Amino acid sequence: MDSMVDDDGVRMLVNYKGTSRSAVKAGFYELKKRMPKFMSKERGPIKVTIIGMGFVAQQAAKALEEFSDIEFLEKEIPGVVVRMLPRTITNHYNLLEEIMKNTDLLIDASKRLDTTKYIVSNKLIGYLPQSAVILDISADPYNDKLNPVQVKAIEGIPTGNLEKYIFETDDISYEGIPKAVDTTNRRVVVSCSAWPGVDPKDCMKVYDKQIKGFLDVLLKKDLDCLDINSENAFERSLYRSTLKYYQGNKEDK
């Protein structure tokens, strides 16, 4: 699905809103359980830091507004302050240290070009408040069978799934993280490799509308006959998702 893109590289079969909303809902209400004075009028605003500024990050910010309004607006309790970090900030370790100290909810909504490099080191996790929650929307997996090793954007956190997406600091899942990864500093983590599946009915309504054009092509054409130069945008997108196209691009690079 990641490779099913239009001529401008924008995904055509995707539910950014559903992905981000499901994730933020889980992370926000996990923070509610743990943050001191969460429902107090006397505290300052809840500080949220989002890594990334793409579609997923933007929808995460909108979802934060939604759940903040639900919880706080009519009660006159301070809501959330959202900071979104582009690469011109995440590339500077000295800036991230201070940002982490002032973050209650850290959200990874990044899309890295190089998955062998961390954005937030495990040492930086140590600067987060003890009550902070890490929300992993991107949910990139570790893969120590590759050389160099594929890692997550935030070092030392587990990756969840639909069966389990909330991890305490002593969770057994940490034992499954590659030994070369530093897991010394830990906070509660909310992570899922299939966020749209948390609210499946709403997600399927979106996919139902998007997938019809692709199915129409597949019902009329054999996969081997897909044409990148077709006048049909759905056919061109399907071709870009084939192994043949991927391998051809890889060889060109």
Can you say where each PLM-predicted feature lies in the sequence?
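Fold-independent oxyanion-binding glycine-rich loops
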Residues: 1-3, 53, 87, 109-110, ...
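Glycine-rich phosphate/diphosphate-binding loop of Rossmann-like nucleotide-binding domains
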Residues: 26-110
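Glycine-rich phosphate/diphosphate-binding loops and the adjacent beta-loop-alpha structural elements
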Residues: 45-46, 111-115, 195-196
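Residue-level recognition of the N-termini of beta-strands and the immediately preceding loop/turn
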Residues: 44-48, 132-135, 187
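Rossmann-like adenosine-cofactor binding region
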Residues: 84-181
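Conserved active-site and cofactor/substrate-binding residues in soluble primary-metabolism enzymes
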Residues: 18-22, 51, 55, 59, ...
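Short, acidic Gly/Pro/Ser/Thr-rich loop/turn segments
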Residues: 57-58, 114, 142, 197
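Adenosine-phosphate binding glycine-rich loop
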Residues: 2-41, 139-253
